[in-house]
Amino acid sequence: HEEAGEALTQKAQQLVAHAKAHKSKIIVPAFALGRTQDLVMRIKRLVAEGRIDPLPIYIDSPLASKVTDVFRKHPECYDEETFRTFTSEGDPFAARYIRYVSSPEESKRLNEMKGPCVIIASSGMCEGGRVVHHLKHGIQDEANIIAIVGFQAEHTLGRRLVEGWDVVPIFGIPTPRRAQVVVFNGLSAHADRNDLLAYVRAISPAPQQVFVVHGEEKQALSLGAAIQTEHPGMAVVVPAKDSIYEI
């Protein structure tokens, strides 16, 4: 379910208070493109409004750093609110408490560092990247928090964390999970079921054929059935893996 903005803020406040009280780490698996930049801007806004105290934040993703540089170079692509922030307050992705980590050596030092701090690293589903190393070193500390801020596909480490597994495979080694897992719903950048149904309704002229892709099988089949029910004359296809269609 989606969480309202105030509920998300209260949850963030609780996490920051916990990290400060326990001198612990908040580990955030995040996609390098879009999600990391969105999180940085959300955190900056909450700090500026006095809603949360600033903690040291480490963006530990070389790709996220490069993508952020692209964002910085093209303010003409921002929405109105972000553009106002950029022109009035300067770089929307920088603050005295935010550091972008580049070298592997600096990334490794984060594992030896005491909290409180926030580590935002990719990959978003914990299937690779530097976040897996941070999980390896931090997941067995019950004072630490793993904050899930995006969709986690089936059979990924991220999904297992969301499902509350007590032991998870990290680099192929069964590893006890003692850190708390906190899920933030409502941050998805994808359209939901109702949005997708509305999108199909709005297409004019109506398509003769619709392919439901980029989703888990159960949900894709359910969405396909819903589209078919609304549009009986439409050919709705949920492609099987490795199938080929000529359009």
What feature does the model see in each segment?
Residues H1-I247:
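Acidic/His-rich, metal-assisted hydrolase cores and their charged scaffolds
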